[in-house]
Amino acid sequence: MSRAALGEQVERFGDVVYAITADERGKGHVVSVTAVWRGDELAVPAGRRTSHNVETTGAMTLLWPAPAGEPYSLIVDGDAHVDGDSGEVALHPTRAVLHRVARADPDLPSCVTVLDA
């Protein structure tokens, strides 16, 4: 699929996401934030730990939980950087999938690619 398809999915899932980062030792950090498009990147507000992790690894994942009754969550991986002017972290999406949730119909595909850059 394409960046346009990703844009459609992000609009459908809304602006509340979980930002997932890891430090240099691989210790995970998860925070609930809002995401907005800034050009071709998704921007989220960032605290100290999220900023540190992104500065260290250059990576972040955003997770939109499945809405009630829906079979898929949206997961977007990408290259990330801290915007020094805004203090936000910007994610340049490199891969996005719809991932089937645990209680969804098992006959549905477990993973649907939205973006594979």
Where are these regions (language model features)?
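Binding-site signature for planar aromatic cofactors or substrates
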Residues: 1-117
